[in-house]
């Protein structure tokens, strides 16, 4: 199956899920967060990039609640232009619920103002995806925002995918410019793609 048809099929499959199924999957996946060990998650003033789900992705509210409980600073990606890298604006207590955020013309919710960082300043970045494979290749929505943003970064955060189990496929045909994941968290498993990551059982 080519990339276009795979992307279309998996996006449709996500959209068919009930709200109850989505929320249950997200809370099951949250358990994988507690098994992930990395220095980026244990330092002081940890800055984490988290996307606001808008296109049928596994809900990120449990992920944000986890980060808040751990005392991490949360930053949401913001699109500033079609061919521009993403910037990240702090998601504060005043704008905690995603439903209160303004909606971008592309469909996702994002803050309009706040403390802004580029991706190199983040310690960890949770990335949306349509599909990932068992060696960490990632297929996004097709806009290339994350690939462009990370390609230009002088340093890169720990890159973690957040997705349903059915979004994991055996192998993707990766392009040279595609940014790979360091780890993937699904409802049933924590996948580690880099040797320096450790799973705490």
Model-identified regions with their sequence ranges:
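N-terminal active-site beta-alpha-beta segment that forms phosphate/nucleotide-binding
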Residues: 1-118
